[in-house]
Amino acid sequence: MFPRLPTLALGALLLASTPLLAAQPVTTLTVLSSGGIMGTIREVAPAYEKATGVKLDIAAAPSMGDTPQAIPNRLARNEPADVVLMVGSALDKLVASGQVAKDSRVDLGQSFIAMAVRQGAPKPDISNMDAFKQTLEKAQSVAYSDSASGVYLSRILFPRMQLDKSFMAKARMIPAEPVGAVVARGEAQLGFQQLSELKAVPGIDIVGLIPDQAQKMTLYSGAMVSKSQHPEAARALLQYLASKDAAKAIEDSGLKPVPAQP
């Protein structure tokens, strides 16, 4: 099992006292992270850097979509990267294309869809499917993401719920920006996104998870980019993120940790 960070930190500090290690250049890993798991990597980064001497250059990048910032589009342009943290189903496509190393893949956390309103606004009832449907139909405006949760809502859940004809006219997909930010500015009354993504946005109140009958779990995973210049360091970071030592950071970010992998 990957050692705990305090142990790593002690070893790193001892090794750092030797002239040989002091002469070594600092390894920097470029980490492309989807918003749903960004809270996790941000939380562990300071201690991980201190313990290992490896610097993490973390960039926000959606798991999918047409924006230039999306991870698949960045890799298609051959932008340098070492590790990707993203929606598992989108990662599967990168594995299939050979852009990430299949044997490096780790599953990290399960995410669920939540609803938010502007801070201080009334919190509508979404405790069951009937109440949820009424809340959607009464809403003045609805926003959802252009990532996995939004695709599911717009293509599967909303049509399945047989909402009134006026609903889709007031619902819109938000590209390249957190849905919570749109809600915080008052540009949408209701916002839907992964709980882990909404938790990071100021100016909103999270009403709660949508009902179980409407819910869809999204798996967040990580892998090493095939063209990584630092494969050993990249694999070590992924091994740590998949260990029980990172479970608290995963949970803090709003995800349900996947059991540590052997």
Swiss-Prot record:
Q: How is it used?
A: May be useful in development of a bioprocess for effective production of trans-aconitic acid.
Task: Indicate the enzyme's highest-level EC class.
Answer: isomerase
What the entry lists under Gene3D superfamilies is as follows: Periplasmic binding protein-like II
Give the regulation of activity.
Activated more than 1.5 fold by Ca(2+), Mg(2+), Mn(2+), Ni(2+), Fe(2+), DDT and 1,10-phenanthroline. Strongly inhibited by Ag(+) and Hg(+). Inhibited by addition of 20% (v/v) glycerol. No effect by addition of NADH or NADPH.
Q: Please describe how the activity of this protein depends on temperature.
A: Optimum temperature is 37 degrees Celsius.
Role played = Involved in assimilation of trans-aconitic acid. Preference for cis-aconitic acid is 14-fold higher than for trans-aconitic acid. Not active on intermediates of tricarboxylic acid (TCA) cycle including citric acid, succinic acid, fumaric acid, and 2-oxoglutaric acid or on other dicarboxilic acids including itaconic acid, formic acid, citraconic acid or maleic acid.
Task: Provide the GO biological process annotations.
Answer: cellular response to calcium ion; cellular response to iron ion; cellular response to magnesium ion; cellular response to manganese ion; cellular response to nickel ion; cellular response to silver ion; molybdate ion transport; response to DDT
Q: Pfam families recorded for this chain?
A: SBP_bac_11
For this UniProt record, give its keywords in alphabetical order, as a comma-separated list. Isomerase, Signal
Q: What's the protein here called?
A: Aconitate isomerase
* EC nos: 5.3.3.7
Q: What is recorded on activity versus pH?
A: Optimum pH is 6.0.
Catalyzes what?
trans-aconitate = cis-aconitate
PANTHER family noted in UniProt: BLR4797 PROTEIN, MOLYBDATE-BINDING PERIPLASMIC PROTEIN
Indicate the secretion signal residues: 1-22
